[in-house]
Amino acid sequence: MASKLTDRQQEILDLIRLTVSRTGFPPTRAEIARALGFRSPNAAEDHLKALARKGAIELTAGASRGIRLKDAGETIPPGPETAASALAGMADAVGRLLLPLVGRVAAGSPILAAEHVEREVGVDVDLFAQTPDYLLKVRGMSMRDAGILEGDLLAVKRAAEARNGQIVVARLGDEVTVKRLQRHQGRIELLPENPDFSPIVVDGTQEFALEGIAVGLIRTQALH
């Protein structure tokens, strides 16, 4: 068990835990310094060494992200707003976005409902021409020929309208689907990009809503 920590050391430890849980990797010294307002990474290094001496973390020499939590299996909620706001500041400082990763969507509930969000993923701002609001885990191969494969993460920007030909996330009744939007003579079609799947024609009896437009794609291999 770690020795008693100072308030500042606890704040840094909470930040490390939150960063690891949301992005899968620890912050660098420079990121900690920017997030918590230190003058230099050396100040962060001093606090990290103190945390290591007290048994809260282990440090790997020569590695910028060489921080390992000693209680990695323990889930500890972050302290008041400090760690969460610091993490958001860190993401801005290093040009990264923290996006909610949406998995399976339950019938009838909002796509960003808490129970749908598997975790948050840190991604490079420069990956996208437009800033996405969330990542949707792709299920199925109906958009294969557009290069969107099972397990990929589709970057989605919330939108209630879309142009013809755009790839959209649409809610049709109780189902959420990724398809190419086509409007023709007042009729809406959701087109797959795989000849093994049939177009979906939206008729007036079905509840239809756009949940967003696709603004980018992340291959799942890129996260490992």
Swiss-Prot record:
Q: Name one GO molecular function term.
A: serine-type endopeptidase activity
DNA-binding region(s) from the entry: 29-49
Pfam families referenced in this protein's UniProt entry, alphabetically: LexA_DNA_bind, Peptidase_S24
InterPro entries per the record? LexA, LexA-like, LexA/Signal_pep-like_sf, LexA_DNA-bd_dom, LexA_repressor, Peptidase_S24_LexA, Peptidase_S24_S26A/B/C, WH-like_DNA-bd_sf
Q: Which residues form the active site?
A: S142 (for autocatalytic cleavage activity), K179 (for autocatalytic cleavage activity)
Q: Which reaction does it catalyse?
A: Hydrolysis of Ala-|-Gly bond in repressor LexA
Q: Which terms are listed as keywords in the entry?
A: Autocatalytic cleavage, DNA damage, DNA repair, DNA replication, DNA-binding, Hydrolase, Repressor, SOS response, Transcription, Transcription regulation
Tell me which EC number(s) this protein carries.
3.4.21.88
Q: Which GO terms describe its biological process?
A: DNA repair; DNA replication; negative regulation of DNA-templated transcription; proteolysis; SOS response
Write down the position(s) of the site called Cleavage.
Answer: A107, G108
Q: Which HAMAP family match?
A: LexA
* Complex and partners: Homodimer.
Give the protein's function. Represses a number of genes involved in the response to DNA damage (SOS response), including recA and lexA. In the presence of single-stranded DNA, RecA interacts with LexA causing an autocatalytic cleavage which disrupts the DNA-binding part of LexA, leading to derepression of the SOS regulon and eventually DNA repair.
What family does the entry list?
A: Belongs to the peptidase S24 family.
- Protein name listed in UniProt: LexA repressor
Organism encoding this protein: Bordetella petrii (strain ATCC BAA-461 / DSM 12804 / CCUG 43448)
